[in-house]
Each structure stands twice: as C-alpha cells, then as structure tokens.
C-alpha cells in the first residue's frame, strides 16, 4: 500500500510549512492526485488520517482533486488528456502516446488557523 508512504511524505511537507509559518493547526488540506498515479482514494483518506495523528494536521478536512494526465500524440502532434496508461489519443485514436504528467500526488493547498 504505497498510499501510506505518499501520505507520510505529504504530512512531512505540511509539518515543515506549519513550522516555518508558526502555524498551530491545519484545518484543511488539498491534495492533487494524478489520474495515472495508481492510488485509491479510500486508501489515501485512510492513510492520511493515520499519519496526521499527533500532528498539526490531525482532524483536518482532506480534499482530493484529480488531475488528468497529459500526453503527446506522435500521430497527430497534439497534447491530449488521458485517463489511463494504455489510452488511445482522443483526437485521432492513435496509440503512440508519450505520457508527460499524471502520476504525482501533490500538496496543492493548506488552510490554517
């Protein structure tokens, strides 16, 4: 379950930011998850709650935003959105795609008191 290690990394980032800005409590966190990141939302929510225990983010609201992946289509020379690894180009139905983004988990925003 790699969601646990991803959430641990996210909470470390949140903790560092909280320390740098003298924040006592984080009330909400927005995570951006790439469409090709292979993470389960329920596992992220479960893991996030566990790793937040005893931190400034304990009990905060978790908001998850999915970001479509972008790929370059070698057949029609266009940047397109894809939602799975073995996708076809939605414009020309070509299969020669170079996926450039979409496999990350990013702390997008933090709301504090």
Curated annotation (Swiss-Prot):
It comes from the Bacteria. InterPro entries: HybF, Hydgase_Ni_incorp_HypA/HybF_CS, HypA/HybF. Gene3D superfamilies: 3.30.2320.80. GO terms for molecular function: nickel cation binding; zinc ion binding. Keywords: Metal-binding, Nickel, Zinc. Zn(2+) binds at residues 73, 76, 89, 92. GO terms for biological process: protein maturation; protein modification process. Ni(2+) binds at residues 2-3. Pfam families: HypA. NCBIfam families: hypA, PRK03681.1, PRK12380.1. Belongs to the HypA/HybF family. HybF subfamily. Involved in the maturation of [NiFe] hydrogenases. Required for nickel insertion into the metal center of the hydrogenase. This is Hydrogenase maturation factor HybF.
């Amino acid at each position: 379950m790699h969601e646990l290690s991803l959430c641990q990394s996210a909470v470390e980032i949140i903790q560092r930011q909280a320390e740098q800005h003298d924040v006592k409590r984080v009330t909400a966190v927005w995570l951006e998850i790439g469409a090709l990141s292979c993470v389960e939302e329920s596992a992220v929510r479960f893991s996030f709650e566990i790793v937040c225990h005893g931190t400034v983010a304990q009990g905060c609201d978790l908001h998850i935003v999915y970001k479509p992946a972008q790929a370059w289509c070698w057949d029609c020379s266009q940047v397109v959105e894809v939602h799975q690894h073995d996708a076809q180009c939605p414009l020309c139905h070509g299969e020669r795609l170079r996926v450039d983004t979409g496999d990350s988990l990013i702390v997008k925003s933090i709301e504090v008191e």
